[in-house]
């Protein structure tokens, strides 16, 4: 079975797809965002598109406590969507998680151009999962 090239897929879906969100920016300029699951930066572009690229990276909050899911797509299983995703759950502290994401994305030559975006998404998600500490109890100093 022959696969369709990513450039052709992008040319077909770039102007009209269900994930496209168009908003007006400053003045009259239009800003386009994307709600794709495999898009790290949510920017509507070929580089970040999860539809057009064979290799994609996704970082999401897990359902359970303080965990983050790092998902990458396998290039060999493109015709079987359920089997094409490789998920790993990260439960460690932030420095170890960031090292694991960097190793997975960059050091394995998977998508080194997405390192900065992946670490930014990981940072935002881990900040959102962090539980705020309760303040120190105020003592009554009147004696």
Curated annotation (Swiss-Prot):
Question: A GO molecular function for this record?
Answer: structural constituent of ribosome
Any one GO biological process:
leaf morphogenesis
Q: Does the keyword Cytoplasm apply?
A: yes
* Keywords of this entry: Cytoplasm, Nucleus, Ribonucleoprotein, Ribosomal protein
Compartments where found: Cytoplasm; Nucleus; Nucleus, Nucleolus; Nucleus, Nucleoplasm
Query: What InterPro entries does UniProt report for this protein, alphabetically?
Result: Ribosomal_eL28, Ribosomal_eL28/Mak16
Disrupted-gene phenotype: Pale green leaves and slightly longer early appearing leaves. Delayed leaf growth and abnormal leaf patterning, with the abaxial mesophyll features appearing in the adaxial mesophyll domain. More proximal vein branching in the petiole and reduced number of small veins at later leaf developmental stages. Abnormal inflorescences terminating early and producing several secondary inflorescences. Double mutant ae5-1 as2-101 exhibits an increased number of lotus- and needle-like leaves. The double mutant ae5 as1/2 produces severe abaxialized leaves.
What does UniProt give as GO cellular component? chloroplast; cytoplasm; cytosolic large ribosomal subunit; cytosolic ribosome; mitochondrion; nucleolus; nucleoplasm; nucleus
Entry comment describing in which tissues the protein is expressed: Expressed in seedlings, roots, stems, leaves, inflorescences and siliques.
Q: What does this protein do?
A: Component of the large ribosomal subunit. Essential in leaf polarity establishment, probably having a role for translation in leaf dorsoventral patterning to specify leaf adaxial identity.
| Quaternary data | Component of the large ribosomal subunit.
Q: Which family does it belong to?
A: Belongs to the eukaryotic ribosomal protein eL28 family.
The protein's name is: Large ribosomal subunit protein eL28z
Q: Gene that codes for this?
A: RPL28A
């Amino acid at each position: 079975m022959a696969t369709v090239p990513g450039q052709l897929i992008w040319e077909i879906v770039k102007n009209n797809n269900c994930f496209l969100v168009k908003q007006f920016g400053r003045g009259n300029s239009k800003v386009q965002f994307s709600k794709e699951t495999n898009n790290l930066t949510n920017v509507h572009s070929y580089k970040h598109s999860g539809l057009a690229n064979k290799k994609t990276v996704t970082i999401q909050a897990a359902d359970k406590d303080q965990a983050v899911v790092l998902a990458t797509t396998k290039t060999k299983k493109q015709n079987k969507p359920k089997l094409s995703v490789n998920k790993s759950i990260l439960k460690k502290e932030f420095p170890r998680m960031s090292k694991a994401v960097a190793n997975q994305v960059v050091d394995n030559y998977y998508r080194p151009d997405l390192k900065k975006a992946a670490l930014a998404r990981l940072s935002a998600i881990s900040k959102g999962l962090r539980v705020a500490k309760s303040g120190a109890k105020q003592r009554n100093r009147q004696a």
